[in-house]
């Protein structure tokens, strides 16, 4: 969600800050701003919209030869997206940027108003700035920060500048923030991608740590005392903002799927590497995730239960921590997150740890909170996704889960032979053949893009596929929704209207007839059907259809979903939607 970066050193401050904000664009935002200082004077420049608009304003308005500064991309949570609510916020001597949610902001605001503070914005962040300014009146800055954090409830990462003090301050609780270490320069950032252009050395802040940065020093304090922190080295390659000739990042990232899939599958051609995939010792698995990652989990659930005989439940992370836990023997909690910083998923992981339950993270970001804190992890190595709607990262999450289900089934001697592993080896080439047919998906999109709603229906694993296909269409073109085919007649069918497209996913021969029966029910009420199926099941002469190659059930979904990703892309393109940055969405959801 919100992105923070800061810099103090000898380079041009605004250039470093803007580069950081551009690298953080993938997180999602609706406004941006910087605060910069030359040691005596402070400038705050904000804009609503893209970082490019902020850069234009900076080029026009910046008059300082600044030495340090902080910057922010905001995704509105408290207060609408406008210039007043954009960060940074200045109250008295304090200027700050904030990622997170201050849950007791309304109460604190009333207290501060009684003390004479007036507020310009609707944000909880301005309340935090005011409280820090109030505490600074009778205390030094480190004490003031400590006292303020004792009052605040909720989550936060702060970058702070103090009038008359030529240092940067940083602290965090639950929201991510790290310190970058350079040569006569230092940085702060929400994640390493914002600063990797300048340094790969960084320090992770723990809750209660306060970082004080000058160009030459980085001091960390905890409970008022200086402490030493390990300097880590990141192997991140940063954000590749190029589109390689494609019109949108989403299309580029879809087309990269065969390559990243091949890289992952190559890792497990060596049988010695497959031991980390074996979950045969567990009798119960909870998969916890949000959004697309949760729908990847639904695919995994179907495969584990069908082929490995392990009971699997899939939960939205936002609900899991509040659920009564009924663990059986040998449980495992699998956490899936592209960013590794999804707030609800992190909270669920920590809840599992409190209960002594083993956790396994499937993550893309090796420097993330989940990657660091889970008991063990598998990295998907999809590379950074710029488009907000995930594509290649989702496919690799499904691939990891599918490989786990297969290896576990083989260890338990429930699946014999090597045919299914061979299906994985053939998968990248088959997927390329699906994606090479992208002009056909554009043609199918012609029958959808002018509609106001759209149903996806399926049974079993096909329903899991429908959920992700529907989410993609919702995210980028604002059309919906997915339903279990057998549940249509229990209420949902009342929503069917004349000429409504209903997409029916059929990859399981045993469920084919029932799914078609449900599709015909919608057609009898005026809908028109579109069938997404496999070559061996294709006898749908009278339907608009998308047909993908037939493969193992362990790999079949990874041919169907990319076809639906392309279909969603072309529907959004024809509707004139902002494909890479859909309205109201953030890539990395770092608040609960």
Model region roles, listed by residue range:
Residues 257-261, 265-286, 376-504, 512, ...:
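Active-site phosphate/pyrophosphate-binding segments
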Residues 551-592:
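Generic C-terminus detector
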Residues 155-185, 449-475, 516:
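Acidic/histidine-rich
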Residues 124-127, 296, 300, 396-401, ...:
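Catalytic-loop motifs flanking and including active-site residues across diverse enzymes
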Residues 67-84, 262-276, 301-336, 342, ...:
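Glycine-rich oxoanion-binding loops at beta->alpha junctions
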Residues 280-426, 459, 505-549, 567:
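Glycine-rich phosphate-binding loops that contact phosphosugars or nucleotide phosphates
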Residues 1-243, 247, 256-263, 271-281, ...:
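Conserved short alpha-helical segments that host acidic/polar catalytic motifs at enzyme active sites
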